[in-house]
Amino acid sequence: MKSPRMIRYLTITSVAIVALSAFSWLGFGVVTNSIKRVDAFAGIEERPEKPTSAVNYLIVGSDSREGLTREEQRRLRTGSTKIAAGKRSDTMLLVHISKNRDRAAIISIPRDSYALIPSWTDSSGDVRSETYSKINSAFAWGGAPLLIETIESMSDVRIDHYIEVDFTGFVRIV
């Protein structure tokens, strides 16, 4: 036979679980009902055709500090643009959206991945021969075009669209 203390413990625990579940369910309902849903396409009669093939995006996060005010640089402790000159890619995501638009796959490319960087023309007009280096060097040396060419050549995946968020954009988003 169970002791009265055990029965009391089980009763209190059961009531607490039921009460917690009820409050959670009610809270979820309040949050769900407070979300404003908008049909952004209502009233638009002429729209472009839906894409009929898969699409690939390269999303790059850059550490460029261009565009930050002196006050923002001081507040965020980023150093000056002279100290952190140039642009390096901190984050690279290759996003594939399926033909039917029912699936998306995202691959994060580590910035220190060793890759064959194709030949490029530097800012002084000198042609540099292909070389092995960290993949984010492609972005620092030749910007988006060289990074795209590097990723396409190493992955054999065509990149259809390019999105870059620099440090200034990141700060303003957050």
What residue ranges belong to the model's regions?
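Non-catalytic, solvent-exposed segments at the cell envelope interface
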Residues: 1-173
